[in-house]
Amino acid sequence: MNLKQLAGEYAANFVNDGMKIGLGTGSTVYWTIQKLGERVKEGLSFQAVPTSKETEALAQQLNIPLISLNDVQSLDLTIDGADEIDSNLQLIKGGGGALLREKIVASSSKKLIIIADESKLVTHLGTFPLPIEIIPFSWKQTENKIQSLGCQTTLRLKNNETYITDNNNMIIDCIFPNHISNPVHLHTQLKMITGVVETGLFISMTSTAIIGTKNGIKKL
């Protein structure tokens, strides 16, 4: 069993009968969803809000009951992955392109459980490119303003074409040469730029991190 599978399957144990949960997106959450599909076959009853079309399709294949976030006041918990996790449980997310929906669902949840393998633990955020979702209109102007904060930017592509999110937006991936020293301040600066929809910085949102390590599960 690989470390992503270890963390992903373990997190499925947090889901109990009657819960309303958020299901994240990515290669680690894939294992959570697979395990939850097995538990549905065994009789577990819960409802889930998917954070992407990819997750929605997988959940439907496994007969996991899906609901809209519009139909609930809050979710009991959300299980999602991360691209980087620092010692304060601040995150970079969005490598899979679903950061906006992931953040909306996470912010509507009583608990956010982050799952990852130990390679995602970092001292400072910023080695992994920070994704920023922007609207397509005048995207180059928005990119220039983002660059003025001191980062190198790349417009995300897929199959040599501009990557389009599930919300019909674009993603700019940003590298900060000296890492991200103050994630809270940077998030605020980015959100003040007109054209920026959301950032991949998840600040003070994580309740628990479940890390798959060579020595087993580690909880943060």
Curated annotation (Swiss-Prot):
InterPro entries: NagB/RpiA_transferase-like, Ribose5P_isomerase_typA_subgr, Ribose5P_isomerase_type_A. It comes from the Bacteria. Its EC number is 5.3.1.6. GO terms for molecular function: ribose-5-phosphate isomerase activity. GO terms for biological process: pentose-phosphate shunt, non-oxidative branch. Substrate binds at T25, G26, S27, T28, D80, G81, A82, D83, K93, G94, G95, G96, K120. Transmembrane segments: none annotated. The keyword S-adenosyl-L-methionine does not apply. The keyword Nucleotide-binding does not apply. It catalyses: aldehydo-D-ribose 5-phosphate = D-ribulose 5-phosphate. Pfam families: Rib_5-P_isom_A. Pathway: Carbohydrate degradation; pentose phosphate pathway; D-ribose 5-phosphate from D-ribulose 5-phosphate (non-oxidative stage): step 1/1. The active site is at E102. It is an enzyme of class 5 (isomerase). Keywords: Isomerase. Coiled coil: none annotated. Catalyzes the reversible conversion of ribose-5-phosphate to ribulose 5-phosphate. Belongs to the ribose 5-phosphate isomerase family. NCBIfam families: PRK00702.1, rpiA. Homodimer. This is Ribose-5-phosphate isomerase A. It comes from Bacillus cereus (strain ATCC 14579 / DSM 31 / CCUG 7414 / JCM 2152 / NBRC 15305 / NCIMB 9373 / NCTC 2599 / NRRL B-3711).
